[in-house]
Amino acid sequence: ALDAVGLDHSLHVFPNIAEPDLVARITLKPERDQDSDWLIKLDAIHKRKTVRAGFRDKPLPVDYLIESAADVSTEHAVMCVNCDPECEFEVLAAVQQADSIWSADKHFMRENASWMHPLRKRSRDGVPARSTKLPSSKELWSAPMQFLGSGERRTLTGAVLTDRDAPMDWANSGIVLSNMLNKVAGRGIGAALMSHPLFLAPTHLLIKESLKTESIPQILVRFGYPERSPATPRRPLVDVMLHPGFGR
């Protein structure tokens, strides 16, 4: 977004080890001419939505998603797209298994609900849920949604993988995920996100085995063309950014 408006910048992730809550420092540099490629990406940011109302019956460009995943991957984090139907089915089954376990955990459900609320004065943490209907994992992660009648892919699952599981790896995963979501948004493709199964040892192991990887899956993604839904609620900039002009 900064590049699109002609502002060059540098990004330093975890600039101060003594301040773990300071995830990144952005330093603005002198203005420069706008980049047409970044204007396209800025448009994609506006179009990007988390899938909240299901997927449309429209075939996905599988090769494009594979190429995009390769483009956004780095030496620190890899965007993996799962094209094997059997493996994908196993991942989806693990998601449903984890959902059943978590749904029976009252403490988890209470904590999860506390992170999705409209009262921003009470807490700045979490997701500004407002009155938007939250997506159900059973709706967005059910196995029968994989294929169209023609055999073409209606949805495709993926994951962001890292070699380690430390704060720097989480940040690098977020960067790769953001780049992937912005890239495919330009083609009208959305994504549902899921991480809860990765917090349970049994389903975490099942997902690693299904993806046939020794790397650590940080977040699961399911790509597809989204049904129409309200824009994803966003937190105000002042909630997540420190600046001399912002008060907290």
Residues covered by each model-derived region:
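Acidic, surface-exposed loops and disordered segments
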Residues: A1-R248
